[in-house]
């Protein structure tokens, strides 16, 4: 049961937020192995050619899954962190804007990509990642998360846009 490895930090990063910390899964080798195995099982009915992980915790689950499934890993980074030619996509945060980037040569036309991250809340970050993959000519096979916070609407937003989503765990609240 992975849920017991998720640490909840009240009032972080601001009052009223219950932060779901998955680093406690990553800190435990058995829990991390189980997380990767469950992720692979969760998506075994879906065909994809590559795994894209969103900066930063999406890199951890994404690279573990990539290793297990013997598929390429594509890092989707915060703006200004990739050394080669990139495209970027902006998205709205609670207090401003941010951007994600991906190398222009990381996805080829028609590549089916599974996008992964640790958690989905409002869906702004992962929606930007979906746009990046599509702009490069890739197809989004789905978006997977360790945790979803359904009350914040991110999963609904993706599903309304026709993107398949799956999560290992679901928590109420913010």
Question: What is each PLM-predicted segment?
Answer:
Residues 1-174:
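PRPP-associated nucleotide enzymes
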């Amino acid at each position: 049961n992975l849920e017991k490895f998720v640490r909840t930090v009240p009032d972080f990063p601001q009052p009223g937020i219950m932060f779901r910390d998955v680093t406690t899964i990553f800190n435990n080798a058995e829990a991390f192995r189980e997380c990767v195995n469950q992720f692979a099982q969760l998506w075994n009915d879906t065909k994809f050619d590559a795994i894209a992980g969103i900066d930063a915790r999406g890199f951890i689950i994404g690279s573990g899954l990539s290793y297990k499934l013997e598929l390429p890993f594509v890092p989707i980074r915060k703006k200004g962190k990739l050394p080669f030619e990139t495209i970027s996509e902006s998205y709205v945060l609670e207090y401003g804007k941010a951007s994600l980037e991906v190398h222009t040569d990381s996805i080829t036309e028609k590549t089916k990509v599974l996008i992964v991250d640790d958690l989905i809340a409002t869906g702004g970050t992962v929606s930007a990642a979906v746009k990046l993959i599509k702009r490069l000519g890739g197809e989004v096979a789905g978006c997977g998360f360790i945790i979803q916070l359904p009350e914040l609407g991110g999963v609904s937003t993706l599903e309304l846009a026709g993107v398949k989503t799956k999560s290992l765990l679901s928590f109420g609240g913010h």
